Amino acid sequence: QSFGNQWARGHFM
């Protein structure tokens, strides 16, 4: 799991 992925989900989505 990548922490960057969760961050992107909240910023891009």
Curated annotation (Swiss-Prot):
A single Gene Ontology CC term: extracellular region
What Gene Ontology terms for biological process does this UniProt record contain? defense response; neuropeptide signaling pathway; regulation of insulin secretion
Q: What is its main location?
A: secreted
> Which parts of the sequence carry Pyrrolidone carboxylic acid?
Q1
One Pfam annotation reads: Bombesin
Record-annotated membrane-spanning stretches: none
What is the role of the protein in this entry? Possesses insulin-releasing activity.
Family the UniProt entry places it in: Belongs to the bombesin/neuromedin-B/ranatensin family.
Mind telling me what this protein is named? Bombesin-like peptide 2
